[in-house]
């Protein structure tokens, strides 16, 4: 692995890196709307649920879930992303918990509180050395019969190559 790859992996663990992405609008993964597969999933949910969205970014998915009556906690550590989520939540008069923090520092008061964790772009952005820690945290947040629902896209790379 070359030093550039290592530098990039170290950068993704920094809120400064992500805040710069949102401030400079270099968020190529951002669809600019709710993720279609999560919209369809949410529209089919019968029971109002408690949903956790890690690395929520601009918040299209958690805001949509809230609009549909679910209790939502959206977490991101990029200041600009959190500002955008709060602005849009206030504009739409939505009840949603938005927390600016490193998800690895999430308080234990949230443990075993969620029916669902929605994973889309957070796991792939985590330094591979911390992915087991991420899995453990998501397990801690889910209720005993809770489910992690995610989109995982194969990159045809090994973990050592950033996959």
What are these regions (language model features)?
Residues 118:
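A conserved beta-strand element that flanks and buttresses the S-adenosyl-L-methionine
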